[in-house]
Amino acid sequence: MAGAPDERRRGPAAGEQLQQQHVSCQVFPERLAQGNPQQGFFSSFFTSNQKCQLRLLKTLETNPYVKLLLDAMKHSGCAVNKDRHFSCEDCNGNVSGGFDASTSQIVLCQNNIHNQAHMNRVVTHELIHAFDHCRAHVDWFTNIRHLACSEVRAANLSGDCSLVNEIFRLHFGLKQHHQTCVRDRATLSILAVRNISKEVAKKAVDEVFESCFNDHEPFGRIPHNKTYARYAHRDFENRDRYYSNI
């Protein structure tokens, strides 16, 4: 992101750069070795790309989760630009999106995002990663605990584990079901981008779960639905007004 930590600090070592490129190209084949998406001359005319761009625009303009995250990014010195920081591309497998830390860019998988609700969740999820990238020096590629923490936060705060989504997945439960969902979704997200065993991914999630599950920034609470997200956005705006008057 503009002014993001990777642009303010010294760049990664050569070995880490190679690992970044390898991970990005495995999941996002349109990423070049330099970390930039390929742009064909007629790419903007493909139907899937047009739909992706329109859904993204609607999400950025109307979704309360995303509007709060955009304000929080700007407040932290990492203002988001639609054309610079989002890219609609075809992706491998069933991946819906990802945050490419090497370019501070969110990749939206136009071949796997098929409706507006899905776009809303993916953009929210990836913006949480971008927010973490902005506010802290996250070692995405060599520290599995850092990745696990951000995945726990994204699963917890993006609405991915909402009751509606879990019913749609035919997952039912009562006691601590939200926590179980967050653990499961975080583990799956790690496995989607790392060639490691499920046991290693689960262990990383377990090690960071308590502290990262209880880190609700910038929402200040778990936004279980859009109403909660609107309240959180209102409180975030009021918090800014309060501190500006001190």
Swiss-Prot record:
Question: Per the record's keyword annotation, is Hydrolase included, yes or no?
Answer: yes
Q: Does the keyword Metal-binding apply?
A: yes
Mind listing the GO molecular function terms for this protein? DNA-dependent protein kinase activity; metal ion binding; metalloendopeptidase activity
Annotated residues that bind a divalent metal cation are located at: H125, H129
One Pfam entry for this protein is Peptidase_M76
Name the Gene Ontology biological process terms.
double-strand break repair via nonhomologous end joining; mitochondrial protein processing; mitochondrial proton-transporting ATP synthase complex assembly
A cellular component annotation (GO) from this entry: intracellular membrane-bounded organelle
Q: Which UniProt keywords apply?
A: Hydrolase, Metal-binding, Metalloprotease, Protease
Which residues carry out catalysis? E126
So what EC number does this one have?
3.4.24.-
Classification via InterPro entries: Peptidase_M76_ATP23
Q: How does it assemble?
A: Interacts with XRCC6.
What family does the entry list? Belongs to the peptidase M76 family.
- Its name, as the record gives it, is Mitochondrial inner membrane protease ATP23 homolog
